[in-house]
Amino acid sequence: YDHEGGIHTPMIAHWPNGIKSKGAISNTLSHLVDLMPTILDATKVKPQANSGGKPRIKWDGRSLLPSLQGKKQPDPAILFFHHAKGRALRSGKWKLVFNRDKGKKANWELYDLANDPNEIKDLAKVNPKQVQALAKIWEAREKVLVSRGKD
């Protein structure tokens, strides 16, 4: 199966006064974390500076308002997915997946999404340098998440 939870998922947006090109399809790379920044941007509401007496941490998401308005929007340089046991990182055509299937040793899987969008052929063993580079990014990200504490 693929590891695109919340990433490669259709979204239907209805906003007659804001979306000018009705019926348009966008292939903008996005994630669920982009919804809050998009809503705030569309409503011109500024996020609170503090939450519970603590400074608000920077959100992972970005506003998709430009895409909704028919403008070209570059894909994020890196996109993280972390839910339950599913973990993945997308960077350009690459996807690094931390696989922890029951009964198997936890390991990294690497997919070339440009040539294998269904994530069939794991390239981790034939491209260990790419795995190492992306794993380093992932591990730095994990430290940030752990330092934030539990949700």
Roles of regions detected by a PLM:
Residues Y1-G5, I19-T28, L32-L113, R141-K150:
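C-terminal cap/loop subdomain of S1 sulfatases and analogous C-terminal strand-loop tails that border
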Residues H8-T9:
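Catalytic cores of eukaryotic secretory-pathway lumenal/extracellular enzymes that build
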Residues A13-H14:
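Short beta-strand-to-turn element immediately C-terminal to the catalytic PLP-Schiff-base lysine
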Residues D116:
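Intrinsically disordered, low-complexity polar regions and short flexible loop motifs
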Residues Q130-L134:
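Short amphipathic alpha-helical coupling segments at ligand-binding clamshell hinges
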